[in-house]
Amino acid sequence: MKFNFKLILIILIINQILIINCKENKILEIYKSGNICPYPLHYRERTGSDDHDFDLGFVYARNDSNCLLPCPSPIYTSQEVNTLSLMIKITGTISFIASLILLLIYSPLINRMGYNRHTIGIFFLTFSVFLIMLTDIIYVHHGNDLICPQSHRYSRQNDSGCTITGILFQYGCIAAVLFWATLSLDLYLTLKKISTKKVEKWYLIILTLIALILTFVPLVKKSYGYLVTGLACWILDSTDQIIFFWAPFTAILGIGSILIVLVVYEIYKISKITKQNRGIFQSHIRPLLMVLFIFGQFLFILAFNALINNKYDEYSARMDSYIDCLFSSSSYSYLCRLKTFPFEMEFIVLFFLRLIGIEVLIFYGFTQQTKKILLHSFLVNNIFFKKYFIRLDGASLDFSTVDEELKVVNFSCNNNNNNNNSNSNSNSNLNNNLNNNLNNNNLNNNNNLNNLNNLNINNNLKNSQNNLNNSQQNEPLSSQKLSENGNVNVFMVESFDNNNSMINQFKHLEEKNNIILNSIISPVQEEQYEEDEINNKNINNNSNNDENN
């Protein structure tokens, strides 16, 4: 009896297993041919052409089913997607602002010093990084809708957002690595003291054309879209990726690495010669570090892509196992896990890519070259900055037009006039004449005044001499004339004393405003002021002569 009970129990268990397997097989058949798909897959009837469905953004889990993969891709958990999204929004925004600041500084809007091989490379490298970071700003604005227009459809080139971000990302990456190599070449040519002014515009045109060709040929082929394994709109076909990105990217990176070795060798030779040349060595450390930093990041991206391609078959097998798990365990599909790309490495690659904008600002935004550009720009050379900000030590601040200089000179002189008028009301006419001469830079008036003063003094001297000669013949008359002439001389002495007093007061005020006057007086104005000072000295000499007489 005991034996029969065990046998019955075994039969029941086997029967239950068979029933479950039968149900699972039926469910699997339903999934393959019916309108039901396990979570998170979604049912969609095929149109008959897999390529057409793929071009529309629909990716089926299996070739023999109507179940679509979810969007975003199941290779990342929801927590990992949120982590990547948050990192992209924060670092992408900061890097975008940093690259925008440096781009404006080196743009023709602010840079009035012209361009050379070095500044051209910085401007276009920054512009390329700016375009890459701009795709992050677009993503911040649209969110996951930019990647997934629908819950189970991936964005394609037909979607405007994908087209724009795809072009910006592809051109930005290609141009960035091209102009990075250009800066490496510039560093080497600078050390070798080789000039390339005649060919600068040509290599700029050639590099831009290369980047445009590698960007718009995939656009003509309608190759842009969001991959199941990606987080950006980029080239879909793996062959096109190699032709239009990875092959030129690797070649340019190889050329750049050779240039880096040559630069390090040249710097080593310079550092071994003399202490004077060590200053040259130190001046090239910052550009070299920038080139090395970007080289390391580009190299890491290349290594990550090589790792993905090397393990592509393994990752594809894991994806197939995940799909099988979903179909075979429909009631427990949430237990199925997909583990393909290493999330940590993906995070580091995306993070390093977004650090480039911050790095270009740190390495190129705080240099003597950038300081000179700012000091010669309208941002510094304006009345508001002169009035409310302290002038930088050792800086030579210039204005773009003489009119702006004269406005500031008149502003300073008018303030001095007000102070002089308040200190000396009794001599207001003389003070106004002097200030008007300085404000209007009227050299002719000063010369006329000097001539008139000299003429009056000479006349007075002659009259005094005549009176002295005739004093013995006509004492009453001579005394009267000497008294009159003496009054005239006293008046002239007092007038010139007042004139000297006002000149000294103006000089005292001019010393107080020395920072403003030194930074804005043009060469023409300096010459006029020197002539005015000579005239003032002549007036002082005439006054002293009059007193002696």
Swiss-Prot record:
Extracellular side stretches: 23-89, 141-162, 220-241, 309-346
Membrane-traversing stretches: 90-110, 120-140, 163-183, 199-219, 242-262, 288-308, 347-367
Keywords tagged on the record: Coiled coil, Glycoprotein, Membrane, Receptor, Signal, Transmembrane, Transmembrane helix
Membrane disposition: Multi-pass membrane protein
Coiled-coil region list: 432-475
Record-level Gene Ontology MF annotations: transmembrane signaling receptor activity
Compartment annotation: Membrane
N-terminal signal peptide: 1-22
InterPro entries listed in its UniProt record: Frizzled/Smoothened_7TM (IPR000539), GPCR_2-like_7TM (IPR017981), GPCR_Fz/Smo-like (IPR050949)
Region called Disordered, residue ranges: 417-483, 528-549
Residue intervals annotated with topology Cytoplasmic: 111-119, 184-198, 263-287, 368-549
UniProt key word Signal: yes
Biased segments, Low complexity type: 417-474, 536-549
GO biological process, one term: cell surface receptor signaling pathway
GO cellular component, one term: membrane
Primary residence: membrane
Residues with attached carbohydrate: 63, 158
Family of this protein: Belongs to the G-protein coupled receptor Fz/Smo family.
Protein name: Frizzled/smoothened-like sans CRD protein A
The gene coding this protein: fscA
